[in-house]
Structures are given as C-alpha cells and as structure tokens.
Amino acid sequence: MSAGGEHLKDEGTRRQVVLAGGIAGLISRFCIAPLDVVKIRLQLQIHSLSDPTSHAHITGPVYKGTLSTIKTILREEGLTGLWKGNIPAELLYVCYGGIQFTTYRTTTQLLAQLDPHRLPQPIESFISGALGGGIATAATYPLDLLRTRFAAQGSGDNRVYESLFASLRDIAKTEGTVGFFRGCSAAVGQIVPYMGLFFATYEALRPVMATAPELSPIPLPPGSGDAAAGIVASVLAKTGVFPLDLVRKRLQVQGPTRALYVHRNIPEYRGVFNTMGLIFRTQGLRGLYRGLTVSLVKAAPASAVTMWTYERALKLLREHEIAAGRDE
C-alpha cells in the first residue's frame, strides 16, 4: 500500500495503471485457475447432492464438494484438467484488469472535480467500481464465455472445441455474433453491484488494514494490509450477487453445444429471469447458491493476489519511472 494511505485514484499515470492492472490479472488468474474450473463444474451441475435418486440416470460425473471435484478431475482428466480454459482466461484477466483499473481511476478523478459538491467517498468508490466492472465485463465478455465453455468440456474425444481459434470459428458459424454474448446481461447485472461494493469496502478498509502488519505479533510481508482488505471486500460483495453469477454460467453454455459438455443434462434456459425462476422452482434457493463455497474460497485469494500484485506492480513502475527521470 502506498504511503499515507492514498486512494487508488491518486496513484500512477494511465500507462502505469494499465500495466499494473494487466500484471495483476495475469498472476491472479494463474493462481486460482483450478478453483475456477471446480466452481464452473459445480455451477453447471443441476441434480441434487442430497437426493441420490436425482442422479441415478446421469451419464456424466457427479461432483460432491470442492475437494471431491478436484480429485475427480485429476483422476479422469489429469492435472491439465484443472487449467482448462486457461488461455482465454489469461487473456480475459489481463484485458479485464487493465480496463477495470483504468476506468476506476479515471472515474474517481472525474468525480473529484465535482467540488464543492463532491459525493461522499464510499459513494464515489461504489460508482467508480461499478463502472469499471461493468465496462470491463462488457468489453471482455466473449473471452469469459470461452473460458466457461472450455472449463465445462471433457477431455479427448469428448472435447467440444479443439482449440481457441476453432471455438471462435465454430461459435461464429453456428451461433453468430450473439453466441459470444450469451448471458452478458446477467454478467453485467452481477458485476456492477459486486465491483461497486468491492471497491467501496476495499477503500474503506485499506487505511485501517495498513497498520495491521505493524500491530501483528508476528512478522507479516509488505502489502499484507492490502491483501486482507481485498479478501474481506471480496467475500462480502461476492455473497450478495452470487445467484447472478450462477445464472451467467448456465446461459453461457446454451446453444447447439449445450448437451456436449461434461454435464450433458443442462436444461435449456431463456433469459436471466427465466433461468433464475426455473432454478428456484426445480432446485430451490439452495440451487441458486450452488458452488458458493468454492467461489468464496477462490474469490478471497484471487482478490488478495490481485490487489497485492496491483499495488506492488504500480509501486515498482512508479519507482522505475522516477529513477529513469533522474538518470536523464
């Protein structure tokens, strides 16, 4: 964290923010990729785990919890199965991180010019976070859809797409442009409040958490306060909007390939409200929160790594530019 508890909007040039955001996204994605695959598999599973008769006729795998799912994937698909969809996901996280942090910084700077009628700091952070998340999600959504489809497909002869370029060609040919944006409304509807809540909470906790390493009875690495603030903010925000995340995943695998993924019994859904209503009627409220545990397990370290890496990368970029200026 920056000295003096600066807000994110006050730090770095536009180029530095883009680079730091991209680096943070790249590293964060690689670290949490296995948990992302597990989350997607659990979210696409429609049968009840508490009722064995509901999956008596299921031909695909039955996943029961995070550790069980990891073991099943390792046994049936090998270690690489836990990194399925990582290429589009890495592209997604790099682009998303750069766009998100740039939009956040730009929006907060624009809002700061409203003096003497400035909004309260938490509201500024919420608006900036919501805009950053919404714009980044819409701009990178095709990569998000590809990430989900690759994570949901089987191995060997059961693969739906052979490569990233093959998936782009096949979706464009069989589903058209609209195929790349299935579930986009649910994604934006989820990410806007999520990122608004995340950044508002993060900015509020950041100055408080900055003193945590100094007060700790054991030595903590630099940036621990940033990581802790990211964890708390992520868990609180993720829980509130999780049903829309699940709806997004169900919609992303619709289309002509719907019955070809690991879960071959995915129902046909039409629209956000239709999907949410059908899940609630057939699986209850619990069905809308399927995969929440692994999602929180994933979101906490992902946000911690993202914010820690972003702060460290931005600091290094700023120091490098200052040093380069002195040498000129």
UniProtKB/Swiss-Prot annotation:
Solcar repeat positions: 12-110, 120-208, 221-316
Leader peptide range in chain numbering: none
GO terms, biological process: thiamine pyrophosphate transmembrane transport
InterPro entries xrefs: Mit_carrier, Mitochondrial_sb/sol_carrier, Mt_carrier_dom_sf
Membrane disposition: Multi-pass membrane protein
Transmembrane stretches, start-end: 17-37, 79-99, 126-146, 185-205, 227-247, 291-308
Major localisation: mitochondrion
Record-linked Pfam families: Mito_carr (PF00153)
MF GO annotations: thiamine transmembrane transporter activity
Record's keyword terms, sorted: Membrane, Mitochondrion, Mitochondrion inner membrane, Repeat, Transmembrane, Transmembrane helix, Transport
Compartment annotation: Mitochondrion inner membrane
GO cellular component terms, A-Z: mitochondrial inner membrane
Family the UniProt entry places it in: Belongs to the mitochondrial carrier (TC 2.A.29) family.
Function comment: Mitochondrial transporter that mediates uptake of thiamine pyrophosphate (ThPP) into mitochondria.
Name recorded for this polypeptide: Mitochondrial thiamine pyrophosphate carrier 1
Annotated source species: Emericella nidulans (strain FGSC A4 / ATCC 38163 / CBS 112.46 / NRRL 194 / M139) (Aspergillus nidulans)
